[in-house]
Amino acid sequence: MNDLIEDFLHFLIVERGLSANTIKAYERDLRYFVSYMDVAKGLTDPNTLERSDIVGFMAFARQEGKSARSVARYIASLRSFFHYLMHDGKMSHDPMIQIETPKQAQGLPKVLNLDDVEKLLSSSDTSTPLGLRDQAMMEILYATGLRVTELVSLKMDDLHLHMGFIQTIGKGDKERIIPLGKTATTVLEKYLEEARPKLRRPKYRNDFVFLNHHGQGLTRQGFWKILKGIAKESGIEKPITPHTLRHSFATHLLENGADLRSVQELLGHADISTTQIYTHVTKLRLKDVYKQFHPRA
């Protein structure tokens, strides 16, 4: 089975051109399934799999505390894997027939209000190179709605500050161009002029915009650690994740009159239904405002 997984991952890289993060997610899901089947059935040949094995795996995952969202992702990964094996003639039947994807509760994105955004953006110690970097990253995230992977992947050639925009490669290798406001541009220029040269190291000749203290490009995990520190310093009691500023970016645009299609393009969503979730957030926030300020609410 492990050899078949390697073949599948190679197919995803070469034929479908999926991102490294997506490939890792597929691999993680499939390895989890194989580890379960090794214990449950001593699996070596996928042709021995039956529908009951998939049902048993789903039950096992839920017993381990996996969410409905995680189980749904496992099922999607297995469907793709088995479809590949059948198409390649390495599997004679589909054990996923009549397997239903678990229904997921549609959670609304967590959004910061403007006061909390201001606290978060002003909580970095800008007297140090790393603090200037952190402030610039926070400003860029809120100003552009970038995903964290897109942020840490930014290269110097992606910046067009004199023209007021940056470019990025998002999901599905789709390029998009995003305007950059004056505040974010000013903060970013300060970081590039005063802090980044101090973080660069001769042995690491890379052109990533945001560098760690070793002079290397930041990782998503590295950014997550930085964000936790900034969130703690800000005193904001709400949970803050790497996606919080992206959610806030989208919601605040819609609240101030931006049309849904423009927000979809800025976020890089392939399907507008993904963007529509933010309209539900704005409606709930309007309801809260009404209850708070209308005399007969």
Swiss-Prot record:
GO terms for molecular function: DNA binding; tyrosine-based site-specific recombinase activity. Keywords: Cell cycle, Cell division, Chromosome partition, Cytoplasm, DNA integration, DNA recombination, DNA-binding. Residues 107-291 form the Tyr recombinase domain. Residues 1-86 form the Core-binding (CB) domain. It comes from the Bacteria. One of its GO terms (biological process) is chromosome segregation. The keyword Ribosomal protein does not apply. CDD domains: INT_XerDC_C. Site-specific tyrosine recombinase, which acts by catalyzing the cutting and rejoining of the recombining DNA molecules. The XerC-XerD complex is essential to convert dimers of the bacterial chromosome into monomers to permit their segregation at cell division. It also contributes to the segregational stability of plasmids. The active site is at R147, K171, H243, R246, H269, Y278. It is found in: Cytoplasm. InterPro entries: CB, DNA_brk_join_enz, Integrase-like_cat_sf, Integrase_catalytic, Integrase_recombinase_N, Integrase_SAM-like_N, Recomb_XerD, Tyrosine_recombinase_XerC/XerD. Belongs to the 'phage' integrase family. XerD subfamily. The keyword Cytoplasm applies. It comes from Listeria monocytogenes serotype 4b (strain F2365). It holds the Pfam family Phage_integrase. This is Tyrosine recombinase XerD. Transmembrane segments: none annotated. Coiled coil: none annotated. One of its GO terms (cellular component) is cytoplasm.
